Amino acid sequence: MNIIRNKYIAALPLAVASLALVSCNDFLNKYPDSRMDLKTSSEVSQLLVSAYPAAHPAYLTEMYSDNTDEQMHSTWSAFDRFQEQAYQWKDIDEVRNAETPYQLWEAHYTAVATANEAIAHINSVNNAHDYDAQLGEALLCRAFAMFQLSTVFCQAYDKTTAQNNLGLAYPTEPEKVVGRLIERGTLAQLYNNIEKDLLQGLELVGTKYARPKFHFTKQAAYAFATRFYLYAQQYDKAVKYADLVLGEQPTDVLRNWTEWNRLGPSGNVQPNAFVMASNNANILLLPVPSEWGVISIPTLLGSKYAHGQLLSKTETLQAAGPWGDSGNEMLYSVTYNNGVSKYALRKIPYVPRVLDVSAGIGIPYSEFAVFNTDATLLERAEAYALSGQYDKAVNDINAELSVFTKKKTQLTLDEIVDFYGSLAYYTPTKPTPKKR
């Protein structure tokens, strides 16, 4: 009996191994993922859903910026090491948080890689013209991801120094060699590559989407071009593309701030309304894993490093402006909590995506209106101002104030100059909105 038993036991691994070899061959005969077996323009469109970065830099950049102060209280603490390292401008070695530099880098280059897979497939087919809309979207996604990376990992663009500042590696084809190095090039070269993709994509991109506010449409491409050319210091082009977004009457397409301000600030009511896809003011929406929707509002989470009362009342939301007291004149209600020093507007929803109900495990998600008409209008105003067209800049500011203030305030250039001319520059002991 022992002999027979040993015989069958010995044979069992051989049988399993044989089955494994058959299964392995079947597995290896299949493509590892659907991106490698694209056959139709519809399948390319499905792939391009993943060509939008699954990350947004708001949390990181707010911690880096002068919108955040250290709040001194014995019961207020940092949310995690990432928040503390970011605020203190330390080298960030945390990688788990979705908004760390590491994860931002990975998410945006993953989006670029996905776009490159789509572009490579389109370039390989005989009926490439049938894929024009998909090619346009892929090029815009690649340009957008690289532009977003440039705002975090590169020096601010200056046409006088861009030839000397480092850019970023700009992959234009699928990676086939592990560890292949791509030269970073200069910031000028990076912007040239972004512009090339942007302009080609703009010509090709379509409008037929099941959920257009989550994809690049013509309008979203124009809004992207406005911001890109503003950053690139080509102000005439920024104005040109903003005109295409805003039309002859910008106030017709701006957000209805009165309606939004009537909503209750508790829960996700205001934030959900702000990013509603049916709102014509929203041009491109980006839902991503993010904790910023809850850390930025008046909760105890991350309350040591926050946009607090002092900032709000002297520099930002409730500070004086040429239109008067911002906290009273603007069509928004500043949300705050007496238990912490956090002052905020409710514009970013926070929704946990549950992965395991029994274990209570989930991923926090937020949604960002990365392009909207109000922002595009103010970008055009900035382009006008930086090119010396001050009267036109004031007209755009007044268009925004007409929908953003309770009294539909209108300003003159002299009033703006007088207000900021008499305002002292910021000092740590006497903070103001005016900074060098």
PLM segments and residue spans:
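Membrane-proximal, proline-rich intrinsically disordered regions
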Residues: 2, 24-71, 309
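Aromatic-residue-lined binding/catalytic grooves and analogous aromatic/hydrophobic interfacial grooves
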Residues: 25, 219-253
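Conserved, well-structured interaction surfaces
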Residues: 82-154, 185-188, 200-206, 361-368, ...
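Hydrophobic-face positions in mid-chain alpha helices that act as interaction patches
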Residues: 239-374, 398, 404-436
